[in-house]
Amino acid sequence: MSRRALISVSKKDGIVEFAKKLEDLGYEIISTGGTYNLLKESGVKVIKVSEVTGFPEIMGGRVKTLHPKIHGGILAVRDKKEHLKDLNDHGIVPIDLVAINLYPFKETISREKVALEEAIENIDIGGPAMIRAAAKNYKYVTVLVDPVDYEKVIEEIKLYGDTKEETRFYLAAKAFGHTAFYDSLIYEYFREKTNMEFPKVITFAYEKVQDLRYGENPHQKAAFYKNPVKSYGIAECLQLHGKELSFNNINDANAAIELVREFSEPVAVAIKHTNPCGVAVGNSIYEAYLKAYEADPVSIFGGIVAFNGKVDVDTAKELVKIFLEIVIAPDFEEEALEILMSKKNLRVLKLKEGYYREFDLKKVEGGVLVQQKDEIDLDESSIKVVTKRAPTGKEMKDLKFAWKVVKHVKSNAIVLAKDGVTVGIGVGQVNRIWPTEQAIKQAGERAKGSVLASDAFFPFPDVVEAAARGGITAIIQPGGSQNDQLSIEAADRAGIAMIFTGIRHFKH
């Protein structure tokens, strides 16, 4: 008795060769629509699904395979007498292999300004039903959703007369993943068009970009996945030069890109272990980089530098003077790129324009925390001067600069800035005075005349008192402590201007 295969694919890579090999191995081929036409034109003896079902394709192809003679053939358990009786009574022929991939929903919604009606017409109904049926009945049916598996299946059939059960189980798992991914894309597309910000059930579809050499540490396996439709940022960077990106490279580069995005004026950002170690704005990218380097010439070594403008020759010449892991920018002058590429191991990334507002996810054991991204802008109307002295124009400019930076520093965080440059950064301490002392110590003499930004309020006046001793002249912080008045009084005694934003920027 010949075996039967059902083939219906939107991605037709390798499908003709696969069908011909199945035919040579004694399989009867049934198919639908465009796949049927392609196979027939290519010389494959193929039967139309409508000939099997005795029912024509209707509604413009919306209904083709949703029929007992198809699903009964796929789902029949071959060693159950009642199933075999049903097959015989209703003239249903078992289907032993199903090769299907689905309507191009992802590709459709990835295009700009796609009408809802077009997206809906690219939601596959019959395909997922057949895939799931075949995967459920993996003990008897081989299901293929990926052309990469065609050759393995052919080889096993040649060797054993059928695929091995362990192979069918693996392919079934892959098939269920395929339909789950497909349904997640559809769900996310529809969810975005509603007000379901935090729905009862949430799914996210990501596809693998690459396997990584290892994770955060060499003993951890890792891979990188991206949003297949609304991808941006590090996931869409074009690598122009250098070694393959590591797990830590990607994580650090992401932090650099997020901080760079805060600024419209030319900015240079140096990142180490996801924290900024030097940030500066300037009249040009070149000036910004020189200032960012001088902010902390020790920590920048082995770090990542990102820009929001085209890297020129002068900047490239400065960049190659030290060891850096990555340089990121939206563009590079041709000669500048050649200079950077002279460093064999330097990774050079071109940042793609565009941004998509999505959830911020934090994995915890047994669950996931979902929140809006911390993207609130500092509203001028929310700035409240709480001290007797208001900041000068220069101080206010530096305060706003420091406020943008402190948002991207691990809490508890303090940033000192002067003339559009960070001069001291206190990172990730368990109280607020320690990062203050850390930042002041790093700044040294540069602390005098600088401003201070804090990601959260001051529970005690000790931060203000330390700032006064360091020569800091202005402070920006959220406010909201029950001891705010003590900090205000300390600032007034020292002649420090202080403003409250009403916004906290914890980062964990």
Swiss-Prot record:
Residues 1-145 form the MGS-like domain. It comes from the Bacteria. It catalyses: (6R)-10-formyltetrahydrofolate + 5-amino-1-(5-phospho-beta-D-ribosyl)imidazole-4-carboxamide = 5-formamido-1-(5-phospho-D-ribosyl)imidazole-4-carboxamide + (6S)-5,6,7,8-tetrahydrofolate; IMP + H2O = 5-formamido-1-(5-phospho-D-ribosyl)imidazole-4-carboxamide. The keyword Thylakoid does not apply. Its EC number is 2.1.2.3, 3.5.4.10. InterPro entries: AICAR_Tfase_dup_dom_sf (IPR024051), Cytidine_deaminase-like (IPR016193), MGS-like_dom (IPR011607), MGS-like_dom_sf (IPR036914), PurH-like (IPR002695). SMART domains: AICARFT_IMPCHas (SM00798), MGS (SM00851). Coiled coil: none annotated. PANTHER family: BIFUNCTIONAL PURINE BIOSYNTHESIS PROTEIN ATIC, BIFUNCTIONAL PURINE BIOSYNTHESIS PROTEIN PURH. This is Bifunctional purine biosynthesis protein PurH. The gene is purH.
